[in-house]
Amino acid sequence: MTHCENCCKSLPLAIFLIIVLGFAVYSNCLDGKFIWDDFGLVKDNAYIKSWLNFPEIMTKGMGAGSGSSSNFYRPLQMVTHMVDYSLWKLNVVGYHLTNTLLHISAALAVYWLINIIFCSQPLAFLTASLFVAHPVHTEAVSYISGRSDSLSAIFILLSLIFYIKSLSSVRNKTYILALLSCVFALLSKENSVVIPLLILLYHYAFKSKFKAKEFLFISLIVLGYVALRLTVLKSSIPVSPVLFQRIPGFFVALAEYARLLLFPFDLHLEYGNRLFSIFDPKAILGLAIAVSLITIAVRQREKNKLVFFSISWFLLALLPVANIYAINYSFMMEHWLYLPSIGFFLILAKGLCLLYDSRRFRYAAAALTISILSFYACLTIKQNNYWRDPVSLYKRALQFSPDSWRFLNELGLEYADRKLNKEAIAAYQKALEINPGLAGVYYNLGTLYSSAGDDRQAIISLEKAVELAPGYVDAYIVLGRVYCRANKKEEALSLYKKLMEIKPGLAAARLDSPCLYFK
């Protein structure tokens, strides 16, 4: 199977059905709430609320607008949040609508790419439909802050599409579009560095004419981006085990990814920063899967180029998230499958097409296709229900990670926001049992006690917070207010004097100084 120079035009009905399917499976997440990182990246992010902050967006990490540090430089994602805020302010429906539209756009780009390469609208349609409906993508779609995956996928696919088109074009227009798409992809997410490898895969798989100059320019753009990320735009890298300790984790992840694609059950938020032995059964299984996939790809290179291309796509697209260069605490994430999964769906779609092409099994193939899509759609709709409600999401995550203090803290915050103080206190206390050194959790617990009028417990928790984090300004201020309310004048004055030594220019401390109340 080779690249078709004059591929037939996209079928309007196929495009329409992909769009309808996308909205059908994600319509129930449109009224979901802000959750997890959405507060830092959207709700509490001052930068997205004015276009005057555009230079800040383009030069700083993702969390800078809310005062937090981040290892990620994804300005295009932040620009989409700026557009959303301009249109909807903080109406969460608009943000979820944008995520859904981005996912559908990525599916249409999948359809376009497969149609160009393999000249088969049924194959392209099935691949895109499986992609848009599979529940493993809910984290990238139902989660507002997860849109970097769909955004980068759109431009990675467009970069490949325009590059392939430029090979048979005498005009530079399509090649310029390929370069621009590459730039936009890199500004969306770090995994876009894989673009040159995917281009080489295309040339190697289909033996198309290689134009060194065109490939060089795209490669230089990617190398320039990598150089900037390692120097000028460098962020702090989380403390992480050395490479040989992380490798078993990749094979465990590979085994899990295979399970999630084939049997997409037990989907949940985060899988943790765990270390594995190379003798772990899942690591051995993952290694066996990797060896098997590579062996099949090599053997099928000449016999079945689609199989070779699909497997190679899957493995190459996983490379940026294989923790070879650690930029994240987790050994795996469900949304990391967003781009690699295209290879899996392409093989599955081809199998369904072959079954349909045999007259004997045509009706069985149609029934099987509808069943698979319906199965995916039902699981996606079910998974969206967890993402709609933060309490449901965190409680589900705790089923798989019961010792996660992060989930317990977030659960406590949600309970507190709903005035469920008893449940919030229980969540905070359990988080502190797991990790007693969490100043932020003590602060959350203290503010909850304070709002409930329990000054004694509030003081105990807030004093522990400032003990663990001597520079915790908010904890000082709230503790000072509780001291004032509890008529502990000397403690309040001493606390604020200490804060003034730590942060002498802090206006909030001066305004809230108990001296104003006790003069």
Give the location of each predicted region.
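Ankyrin-repeat and related helical/solenoid repeat scaffolds used for protein-protein interactions
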Residues: 463, 467-477, 481-486, 490-494
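Polytopic membrane enzymes that build or remodel cell-surface glycoconjugates and lipids
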Residues: 2-447, 451, 467, 472-474, ...
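Terminal, low-structured helical/coil segments at or just beyond the last alpha-helical repeat
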Residues: 493, 501-519
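Residue-level detector of bioactive/disordered segments in secreted/extracellular proteins
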Residues: 6-10, 485-486, 517
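Register position in tetratricopeptide repeats
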Residues: 417, 451, 485-486, 519
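Low-complexity, intrinsically disordered tandem-repeat tracts enriched in small residues
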Residues: 439-441, 461, 486, 494-495, ...
